[in-house]
Amino acid sequence: MSLQPVPHRLLFSDSDDEEDGHSTGEDSAFQESDSPVSRLREKQEGPGGSWEEEEGLGSSPIKSPGHFFMCDSPTYRDLPPASPPGPAASPPDCPGTPPHKTFRKLRLFDTPHTPKSLLSKARGIGSSALRFRGGTLFREAEKLPKPEFTYSTPQVNINPFTPDSLEIQSSTGLCRRRKRALLNDSCGEDMEGSDCELEDEDVRPAKRIPITESNMKSRYATEFHELEKIGSGEFGSVFKCVKRLDGCIYAIKRSKKPMAGSVDEQNALREVYAHAVLGQHPHVVRYYSAWAEDDHMLIQNEYCNGGSLADAISENYRTMQYFTEPELKDLLLQVARGLKYIHSMSLVHMDIKPSNIFISRITVPNTGVEEGDDEDCGSGNVVYKIGDLGHVTRVSSPQVEEGDSRFLANEVLQEDYTHLAKADIFALALTVWCAAGAEPFPTNGDQWHEIRQGKLPRVPQLLSQEFVDLIKLMISPDSEKRPSSMALVKHSVLLSASRKNAEQLRIELNAEKFKNALLQKELKKAQIAKAAAEERALFPDRIATRSTTQSNRTTRLIGKKMNRSVSLTIY
């Protein structure tokens, strides 16, 4: 009697939970003793049963998607067709059903696809890194580099100039410890140690400048039409642009080099932080937005049609025409107002110089002076604005980066940061003196030290002694003796009788009106008291008779605190 091979059919349990179909690679990498098929085989065949007897799988009336993947395999095509099962070979309790989800756990979509090879493969990948399922269809995805660890915390920047930034930074330490513990627990044996070792700043990651915009259109080219290049510096170039949507002109500052990881990156972010905190002020260049393109930072600022103060000074040198004393006082007063606003926010500029002061010329009909006009325009409708906030720092926790050495105070060079606001006053004095016609200041040497000792260089014009004394006071070697920005905006030299602004005149007028009202009130009281005293002295009998008549009059109380006389009319 010839023996026919008895085909074996894999049995799968239906008791698996639904979520097993979504398990990871580690869940599907099972051991032979843990497999439900092995347990069933042990019951049916005993210890002599072996996976090696398996030669093929029974056909199913419904083909799974994996069938088409296996058909492409050369090993699958070379297999002989399975013999049709006989009546005695088909287990009555295992009808032909579609492949169960446990079937996918066997990873039969790869070749070779014998149970023994699958188990050995499962053991091999059980302790390795997680991989994609799906066999050759997703084989290309496995070749991709390992994606970076994703954080649940969104990437945001912490503005160091906001009032609540200190509170956020103080609470960051606790969050770092908690998140580090969670990350250490989540790192398994299959992950490299470098994946779990995170820096402190990675726990709350900051949004960095580099942004991949290969699939995005340039915002600069889409939203703005470039007119001309109006300036350049260490940071980059400034372009005059028209926004296509509103038709207004803006100044777009673009960094020269890619800023990702460079020293200028922090300066650019510091400028954006300072602009966002300061908001809008008449004597600070207005900020609108900032973004990054191809690792370059772009900042959209207000366009000042008068250029910079440095350009005006260069033109004055060429034409031998300098700022007059009233113009110098107006320049000093307006920039002092801008510094007063910056200092009131507990910030310091740290880079005041002619190239960072911009001029805006406003054409306004001559309709008279109104309230508040002093903050919007100076003499001749010229407004001076402070710009380039890349060196701004906080007074309480300074991170000082030295600006231009020609306008740098000596105490900053000596790393004495106790009076940083007075360093801005020192730089402002030299800026005004430069506009007065002084020669360009040295970057070092004996003349540099003479200026720090309070000696001003000569200027080609005659200025009043009180104005010169004010400039000398602003560059005093003792920083404590220098006037503050608050004192400058109220200084008598800058607010002379002929140059008092409308607000100052209104305040003085209201004060005089209040004094006049008080005097009139006191005068009226004195007049009433004097008249009463004279009446008592001249007519004492009349006053006594009047009081007696009023007391003898019959009255009746009606209502609350109301006396009415009783009258009777007889018809």
Swiss-Prot record:
Question: What is the first-listed, main subcellular location in coarse terms?
Answer: nucleus
* Entry's EC annotation: 2.7.10.2
- Enumerate the residues binding ATP: I230, G231, S232, G233, E234, F235, G236, S237, V238, K253
Q: Does the keyword Cell division apply?
A: yes
- Kindly list the positions annotated as binding Mg(2+): N356, D388
* Record field: catalytic activity: L-tyrosyl-[protein] + ATP = O-phospho-L-tyrosyl-[protein] + ADP + H(+)
- Looking at the UniProt record for this protein, which Gene Ontology cellular component terms does it annotate, in alphabetical order? cytoplasm; nucleus
Q: Which UniProt keywords apply?
A: ATP-binding, Cell cycle, Cell division, Coiled coil, Kinase, Magnesium, Metal-binding, Mitosis, Nucleotide-binding, Nucleus, Transferase, Tyrosine-protein kinase
Q: What is this protein called?
A: Wee1-like protein kinase 1-A
Q: What is the lineage of its organism?
A: Eukaryota, Metazoa, Chordata, Craniata, Vertebrata
